[in-house]
UniProtKB/Swiss-Prot annotation:
Phosphorylation is a light-dependent reaction catalyzed by a membrane-bound kinase; phosphorylation occurs on Thr residue(s) in the N-terminus of the protein. Gene3D superfamilies: Photosystem II reaction center protein H. NCBIfam families: PRK02624.1 (NF002728). InterPro entries: PSII_PsbH, PSII_PsbH_sf. PANTHER family: PHOTOSYSTEM II REACTION CENTER PROTEIN H. Residues 1-21 are annotated as: Disordered. Belongs to the PsbH family. This is Photosystem II reaction center protein H. It comes from Drimys granadensis. Keywords: Chloroplast, Membrane, Phosphoprotein, Photosynthesis, Photosystem II, Plastid, Thylakoid, Transmembrane, Transmembrane helix.
C-alpha cells in the first residue's frame, strides 16, 4: 500500500493568527466577477499612455529626438 492514513498523525490544524484575521476580508470576494466590462477601458487607456511614454523615452535614449538647449554628448 503506497499511502496510509494514521490517526493522530503529526499533521496539525492551521493556527489562527491576528494577521490572518485582518487579511480574511480581502479574500472574501475571491472568484466573484463584476458584470460588464468594469474598468477594462480605463486599463486600456493606461496601457496606451504607458506605451507612448516608453516610446518617447526610447527615442530620447536613441538620440532620435533632440531636445532644444540640451546637448547630447
Amino acid at each position: 500500500m503506497a499511502t496510509q492514513t494514521v490517526e493522530g498523525s503529526s499533521r496539525s490544524r492551521p493556527r489562527r493568527t491576528t494577521t490572518g484575521n485582518l487579511l480574511k476580508p480581502l479574500n472574501s470576494e475571491y472568484g466573484k466577477v463584476a458584470p460588464g466590462w468594469g474598468t477594462t477601458p480605463l486599463m486600456g487607456v493606461a496601457m496606451a499612455l504607458f506605451a507612448i511614454f516608453l516610446s518617447i523615452i526610447l527615442e530620447i535614449y536613441n538620440s532620435s529626438v533632440l531636445l532644444d538647449g540640451i546637448s547630447m554628448s
